[in-house]
Design a protein with these regions (language model features):
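Extracytoplasmic
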Residues: 20, 49, 68-69, 80, ...
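Exported/periplasmic ABC-transporter solute-binding proteins
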Residues: 18-47, 60, 64, 79, ...
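Bacterial N-terminal signal peptides
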Residues: 6-14
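Short beta-strand-centered segments that line the small-molecule binding cleft or hinge
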Residues: 63-78, 82-96
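Bacterial N-terminal signal peptides that target proteins for export
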Residues: 1-4
Length: 260
């Protein structure tokens, strides 16, 4: 019995030690698919000797995990949903981190003057369109555009379909099936060489994609939240914001830092 108690005690100490050196970061599939996390996280892990456990989900699912206390930090991209999360007391603090933009891609470049004209054209001609359909930041952005231009997606015909998948899978499906879809530029650039799609519409101002970081309220879990504070402060630091600006794909800067 003494041996069993000793083993149990040592195991408890070991697991507690591992927990103190781990951070659970729940983030978006777009940041995961784009390769950005593989670029930026090693800097944090090396500086603080903390292992970051990444869980990639659509923003809606990421926020749900935060509400359950199954995350230390959230790194997402739908401001309205994030503020609902914060106002409900699930988050302790939030800040903007960086932005890029979305694109409409598909089998042909539509060359229209605005995102509204692009969505009008897709609707009027019933061009086959894949929606993420997963309550992700990208999905919510797409829905907000349809609503902004006076459309109700629940009335759309079979030309409009939901994939229920992440950004990478949805892009692959759009390429294979000659559908249009909305994507973030970083995931598109990461997968560009494997896709047979054209940029149908692109405009930084009209399709802005803002990313924010939130520290989950520590009352929702029983983990030490020191690492969450470390990461939150670190991602907003001037030198790390420079690192963010230096991440490039397609010979383009992928993210523009705007920490508050």
């Amino acid at each position: 019995k003494k041996v069993l108690l000793l083993i149990t005690l040592l195991l408890t100490i070991f697991l507690s030690s591992c927990q103190k050196n781990e951070l659970i970061l729940v983030t978006t599939t777009s940041l995961d698919n784009s390769g950005f996390l593989e670029y930026i996280l090693p800097y944090f892990e090396e500086e603080y000797d903390v292992k970051v456990k990444v869980i990639a989900r659509g923003t809606g699912a990421a926020l749900a995990l935060g509400e359950l206390g199954e995350a230390d930090v959230l790194f997402t991209h739908d401001y309205d949903s994030e503020m609902i999360f914060m106002n409900a007391g699930f988050g302790e603090k939030r800040s903007n981190v960086m932005f890029n933009h979305f694109l409409v891609v598909g089998p042909e470049a539509l060359n229209l003057e605005s995102v509204e004209l692009t969505f009008d054209y897709i609707y009027d001609n019933e061009l086959e369109f894949y929606s993420r359909g997963d309550a992700s930041g990208t999905h919510l952005k797409e829905l907000s555009q349809w609503e902004l231009f006076g459309y109700d997606v629940s009335t759309f015909g079979d030309w409009y379909q939901e994939t229920g998948q992440g950004m990478g899978t949805t892009l692959s499906m759009a390429s294979l099936d000659d559908h249009y879809t909305l994507t973030d530029i970083a995931t598109f650039c990461a997968m560009k060489d494997t896709l047979e799609v054209e940029i149908a519409f692109e405009d930084v101002n009209e399709l802005l994609n803002q990313y924010g970081v939130m520290k989950v309220n520590p009352d929702l879990h029983n983990r030490d939240d020191l690492n969450a504070d470390l990461f939150y402060d670190w991602i907003l630091r001037d030198d790390v914001q420079v690192l963010i600006s230096e991440y490039k794909m397609c010979d383009l800067q992928m993210f523009y830092p705007n920490a508050e």
